[in-house]
Amino acid sequence: MTQVAHANSRLQEVLDKGVLRVGTTGDWNPMTMKDPATNSYRGFDIDVTTELAKDLGVKVEYVATDWKTLVNDITANKYDITGSASLNMSRAKVAGYSQPYFYLAFVPVVQKKDLAKFSDWADFDKPDVKVAATLGTVQEKMVKDFFPSAQHIVIEAPARDFQELLARRADVSVTSNVEAATLVEKFKQLAIVPVKEPRKPTPIAMLLPQDDQVWINYINHWVELKKTQGFFKQTAEKWGLKSM
């Protein structure tokens, strides 16, 4: 039984084909960023999955996806594994996860000139506040739960929620502390609201086919080994990332 399971596993398929297919969105700085001119990717996730492919002894192939189809594409066998994704139980109903290797939390981002109006989470739960979110992201459900009284602007990738904020069509977007730090550095008109504490501390892991325990076990062993050897810590530091 074990030999049959191994033979039918995605692990054996990857080894036989010599290619690891990785689903990535290319729009989460600094985790995964796509250069449209070259169609190449860079970021924390790219370093992680390149290392995984190297340890498997195979090539890596990046498959473009977006947040609303990230889980469906793993179940449809469009790729073998994803880059980093927030762990949530809705996704876990239909896809498997590796063990986590990074932790983040969520903060609100506003126009810097609006900091006088917004100082904590409760300030956004008002009928005259417009909250932006990207379809299919963890934040889409999160902001509806956080701010039921607010107006919700849900936009579809490749557009992003923070672009609504930049265009003044929204008052706030909620994103990870990771992305928020890169946004306020890139766009000087934006600021992170100094809330009392970030919300929803969340593990980050890779998505895998739910019914392939052999493949999940292999990836979990790899993650544990690399965590122990300091690989994830060093890679996070390279990209200016700080785990919660």
Language-model segment annotations:
Residues S9, V138-H152, P194, V223-M244:
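Ligand-binding clefts/hinges and TM-proximal coupling segments of bilobed small-molecule sensing domains
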Residues A7-A85, K93:
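Extracytoplasmic small-molecule ligand-binding "clamshell" domains
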